[in-house]
A protein has these predicted regions:
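Intrinsically disordered, low-complexity regulatory regions enriched in serine/threonine/proline
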Residues: 4-171
Length: 171
């Protein structure tokens, strides 16, 4: 379940039944991400895949909603429908609050100390979009010096996401 609003991609994600997460990212994030990897053809993908596809950038986690304490099969259809309606109502309110605090997707920069993106890729993409290339290069060099590498790695070239970002920054 996702929506594009005011330059942001918002999505409700769940990997199990205990929690549902409201996530957001600027719509430009995946476009820039794919430019860095020379994968411009991905820009033609459906919006749903652009937002949460296998090679899209992680969104910022805005909110966690408790969903089910037990297995979904133990709830009837009416109970599940009510629970989802409640989540949707809460998410709409939280999206509106987020947009009041961050009305311009072009200037949004997520918390760099988040726990949902160990590689800080959305953070770096938003900095790059805002012309803060030197800050990104310095931060990535510091992370690499500490031995941190990204989850995504191109085995053929031996490069990880940080290497691709550094290469793109050199231009």
């Amino acid at each position: 379940n996702w929506i594009v609003k005011d330059g942001y991609f918002f999505c409700l994600q769940h990997l199990g039944f205990a929690s549902v997460y409201l996530e957001a990212k600027p719509m430009y994030a995946d476009d820039l991400w794919w430019d860095i990897f020379n994968l411009s053809e991905n820009k033609k993908c459906p919006t749903s895949l652009r937002g949460i596809g296998a090679f899209s950038i992680h969104a910022a986690q805005l909110k966690e909603y408790a969903f089910l304490n037990e297995c979904a099969e133990e709830n009837n259809e009416e109970e599940l429908s009510k629970k989802w309606q409640n989540i949707f109502c809460l998410a709409v309110q939280d999206i509106e609050n987020f947009l009041r605090n961050h009305p311009n997707a072009d200037t949004f920069i997520p918390n760099k100390n988040c726990n949902y993106d160990a590689d800080k890729l959305l953070y770096f993409i938003t900095l790059l979009h805002n012309g803060r290339k030197n800050e990104v290069v310095q931060a990535i060099k510091e992370l690499k010096a500490k031995g941190h590498s990204c989850q995504f790695c191109d085995w053929a070239s031996g490069m990880d996401s940080y290497d691709f970002i550094l290469k793109w920054c050199k231009g």
